[in-house]
Amino acid sequence: ALAVLSKGPVGALVPGLVIFLFLLTQKKWAELLHMRLLIGIPIFLLIAAPWFLYMYHLHGKDFVIVLLGVHNFLRATQPEHPENNVFYFYPAIVLVAFLPWTGFVLHGLWKGILDAWKEKAPIPRFLIIWIASYYLFYSLMATKYPTYLFPIWFPSALLAAIYLPWVPKKFRFFEYILPISIWWVALMVGAYLFVPKPLSWFVIGLFLTAGIFHLSFISKGPKGRFLPGVVLLTISCYLIAS
């Protein structure tokens, strides 16, 4: 009901699509009886309906035209920000938004897709359907905003957590990977903000390369094995950047 108040009909449409597709794949329509729809629907209307009725009372058909026409139909068919209307916009958002956990999220998504259709894996199936429904729905819309993908953060994080034990041990050094990733990302952000263009892109490339080597060194050997080389590489990057 709150989603409908803030986003309009789409606030019920996409969650309803997720539930429908999940029940369709599970072939357990009897679950609808356990959703207490006879109680839920009146509560939904009690929360959402008064505002819509009041707005219609104040503005008449203009409210319907603006709500459905401008904020739903036009956004779906006409891009408000044409520069964002590219195929790689949402993939880039996903990769950046989950830093420094992107690798674990991608691993969880991959394992979840593989397990989604197993008979005894309803939770991964539900989470994958949840993510896919929102992602595909908003990818097909002409207007693209980073905030449109917010509903997939929660199921993506759950998948990453569920399949974390299946991540190879050499990639599970959280005490090293997390601070190191944050460190190198912070350096790249700082280079982008404070180093003059186009030199900043060169510095970002150096920091990115150094960060990748740093993490790969840690994953291949015990703590401190390649520390001297990493320190020298870091100092070199600082000298070049300065």
Regions found by a protein language model. Name each.
Residues 105, 162, 187-188, 208-220:
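Alpha-helical transmembrane segments
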